[in-house]
């Protein structure tokens, strides 16, 4: 992974998170349909996240996280450092927003039930999309994809870090807990893993051609109707809005990344690079925090959804709030990982981590 490729993937990651934000903002109940053209691209951005995730996970498992302990702690800290604040924010804003404008919180806008405690508990264990379940932690619709992502992490860890009987048992248990709906999109995530493994197989002189071909393929696909070209079977056993389009888009994104890895990427100035890195660091927080903020500000900001002032304020407050909170949360990931490592070592009766020993001696 070169510095340039890492930077460009960071830009793609933030771009995908911003696309999801705009797609949710563009709904009629929030903005009166402003940017309606981008509404259906939110799901496409999530599929891009899956491919990027598979690529990055394959990379770190070969470089920085080469043991099950290191990998598991990193994934756990990555997820829960944002999930816990997101749960608190969602519960708080939902309760206030519902009291102000119940219409924005009807069942047609989210997968709500009459048992919010169970919803949050199942979501915390990533069981909200298992088998035929469709449960969310309050009105936080983007959380659906984390149920998929977390189980892909588990299945990958079982396949890479375990051997023999434990590997088979772990894969079977994870598969049964995840259920078929989550497994349907596993090939999209694995396309990212394949992109990492096969990136060096492409002759460098073909990298630019592959990039152009992928961009042209995506433009042509969307020009002819995009996901509307594909049959969308409806079943509780399938992911939401599932179609063969998911696999086509996933393949295009994976091939695009392989192309990026095989061209000479220009590096921007240091100031711009730092900006991209900082924004990319907020991507996960932006993704998971923006929806409750959009709902909340959609309820409290006065005026009709299609009013100019309402549109500007809701967009600015929700985006600024999500980015600001994400920038505060992101640094906690490293601290949480260190705390989890200490707790794990105590639980297993292992010596404390070196950092803890140094702290005690100082």
Which residue stretches match the model-derived regions?
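Membrane-interface helix-loop-helix regions
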Residues: 58, 79-150, 154, 249-261
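Alpha-helical transmembrane segments of multi-pass membrane proteins
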Residues: 73-86, 160, 281
């Amino acid at each position: 992974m070169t510095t340039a490729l890492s930077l460009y993937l960071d830009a793609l990651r933030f771009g995908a998170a911003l696309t999801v934000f705009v797609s949710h903002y563009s709904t009629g109940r929030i903005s009166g349909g402003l940017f309606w053209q981008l509404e259906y691209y939110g799901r496409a951005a999530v599929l891009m996240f899956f491919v990027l995730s598979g690529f990055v996970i394959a990379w770190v498992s070969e470089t920085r996280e080469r043991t099950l302990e290191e990998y598991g702690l990193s994934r756990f800290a990555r997820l829960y450092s944002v999930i816990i604040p997101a749960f608190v924010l969602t519960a708080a804003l939902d309760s206030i927003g519902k009291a102000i404008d119940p219409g924005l919180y009807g069942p047609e806008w989210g997968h709500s039930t009459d048992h919010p405690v169970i919803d949050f508990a199942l979501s915390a264990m990533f069981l909200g999309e298992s088998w035929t379940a469709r449960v969310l932690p309050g009105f936080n619709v983007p959380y659906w994809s984390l149920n998929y992502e977390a189980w892909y992490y588990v299945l990958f860890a079982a396949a890479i870090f375990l051997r023999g009987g434990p590997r088979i048992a772990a894969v079977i248990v994870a598969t049964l807990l995840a259920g078929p709906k989550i497994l349907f999109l596993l090939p999209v995530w694995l396309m990212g893993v394949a992109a990492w493994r096969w990136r060096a197989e492409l002759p460098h002189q073909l990298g630019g051609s592959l990039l152009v071909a992928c961009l042209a393929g995506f433009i042509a696909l969307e020009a002819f109707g995009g996901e509307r070209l594909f049959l969308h079977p409806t079943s509780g056993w399938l992911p939401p809005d599932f179609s063969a389009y998911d696999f086509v888009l996933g393949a295009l994104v994976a091939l695009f990344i392989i192309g990026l890895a095989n061209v000479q990427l220009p590096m921007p100035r240091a100031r711009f690079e730092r900006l991209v890195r900082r924004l990319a660091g907020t991507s996960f927080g932006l993704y998971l925090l923006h929806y409750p903020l959009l709902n909340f500000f959609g309820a409290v900001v006065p005026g009709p959804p299609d009013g100019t002032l309402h549109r500007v304020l809701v967009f600015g407050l929700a985006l600024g709030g999500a980015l600001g909170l994400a920038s505060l949360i992101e640094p906690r990931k490293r601290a949480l990982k260190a705390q989890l490592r200490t707790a794990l070592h105590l639980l297993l009766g292992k010596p404390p981590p070196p950092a803890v020993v140094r702290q005690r001696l100082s």
